[in-house]
A protein has these predicted regions:
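A short, basic/flexible loop-to-alpha-helix module at the beginning of a structural domain
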Residues: 1-2, 113
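Conserved N-terminal/central alpha/beta ligand/cofactor-binding core
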Residues: 32-174
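N-terminal Rossmann-like FAD-binding beta1-loop-alpha1 element of flavoenzymes
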Residues: 4-29
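Phosphate-coordination loops involved in phosphoryl transfer and adenosine-cofactor binding
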Residues: 2-4, 154
């Protein structure tokens, strides 16, 4: 099997990376089991983002720093929080059916927002209590529909040969 980019893992991170990279490269995604067997599909609550009038990035950042007892990397927290609204909009465009029922946001959507522990504002978008499953299904569908992405379930990498110099890397399983 030859590919420009090999991604090991078919959860939200792996599939999101595959969709982004497939704009310019041939991408193969390996999953050690079924594509939806990872942790993403089990996430229940929702995704936090500043989407409500009156909420601010600064407030969300402070809530996150307090919840992390100051152990979080502030630059990382700021980056994630400032990009969360656009990430949620991308997920919605991929077909994640976030619950509706809130005020119209900057994307013209009326997502229902909840408030969960550690948050000072309503900022959790959700799909009932199965947000992870909905996100996983939307990402899988988009990846399946992309001609530059090959999805390989039930495959654990063991010997990978990469680059012009035939460097060899080993992990458990087999390709």
């Amino acid at each position: 099997m030859e590919t420009d980019i090999l991604i090991i893992g078919s959860g939200a991170a792996g599939l999101t990376a595959a969709l982004q990279l497939a704009q310019k490269h041939k991408v193969t995604v390996l999953a050690k089991g079924a594509l939806s067997d990872g942790a993403t599909a089990w996430a229940q609550g929702g995704i936090a983002a500043v989407l409500e009038p009156g909420d601010t990035f600064e407030s969300h950042i402070e809530d996150t720093m307090v919840a992390g007892a100051g152990l979080n990397n502030r630059q990382t927290v700021e980056f994630v929080i400032e990009h969360a609204p656009q990430a949620i909009d991308r997920l919605a465009k991929l077909g994640v059916p976030f619950n509706l029922g809130g005020p119209t946001n900057e994307f013209g959507e009326q997502w229902h927002l909840t408030r969960e522990g550690g948050h000072s504002h309503r900022r959790i978008v959700h799909v009932n209590d199965a947000t992870g499953w909905a996100v996983q299904q939307a990402l899988e569908s988009a990846a399946r529909d992309n001609p530059n992405i090959t999805l390989v379930p039930d495959m654990v990498a063991i010997d990978l040969i990469v680059g012009r110099h035939q460097e060899r890397f080993s992990t458990s399983g087999r390709v």
